[in-house]
Amino acid sequence: MNIVISKPDKNKIRQKRHRRVRGKISGTAARPRLNIFRSNTGIYAQVIDDVAGVTLASASTLDKEVSKGTKTEQAVVVGKLVAERAVAKGISEVVFDRGGYLYHGRVKALAESARENGLKF
């Protein structure tokens, strides 16, 4: 008798959660969506107008301004950069899309940093 124990794929569960949430939230020109993607090595943030299908502002750990520090410290800098770039384009209010990730750690650090630097959500 063979018993197969399968471990749930956390990324598949996250993607399913993200698809479910994306059905409910959408970014407009007046209030675009602040989307987060978190990988093992980096974190990426985009301010997106879903109606027009364009990215209005973005920042990531690949930017030259973000290089030193722990991953959480880098997330704080990415939050600051994306907020500054969005505010420079006249965007002050966004809808926060955490990408199916838990609001904890790097995602929370990025969100709080973006709030401190002028984005409202």
From Swiss-Prot:
Q: Which CDD domains match?
A: Ribosomal_L18_L5e
**InterPro entries according to UniProt:** Ribosomal_uL18_bac-type, Ribosomal_uL18_bac/euk
In alphabetical order, the GO MF annotations are: 5S rRNA binding; structural constituent of ribosome
Q: Name one GO cellular component term.
A: cytosolic large ribosomal subunit
Q: Name one Pfam family in it.
A: Ribosomal_L18p
Is RNA-binding given among the entry's keywords?
A: yes
What's the domain of life for this entry? Bacteria
Entry's Gene Ontology BP terms: translation
UniProt keyword annotations, A-Z: Ribonucleoprotein, Ribosomal protein, RNA-binding, rRNA-binding
State what this protein does: This is one of the proteins that bind and probably mediate the attachment of the 5S RNA into the large ribosomal subunit, where it forms part of the central protuberance.
Quaternary organization? Part of the 50S ribosomal subunit; part of the 5S rRNA/L5/L18/L25 subcomplex. Contacts the 5S and 23S rRNAs.
Family to which the UniProt record says this protein belongs: Belongs to the universal ribosomal protein uL18 family.
Under what name is this protein listed? Large ribosomal subunit protein uL18
Q: Which organism is it from?
A: Streptococcus suis (strain 05ZYH33)
Provide the gene name from the record.
rplR
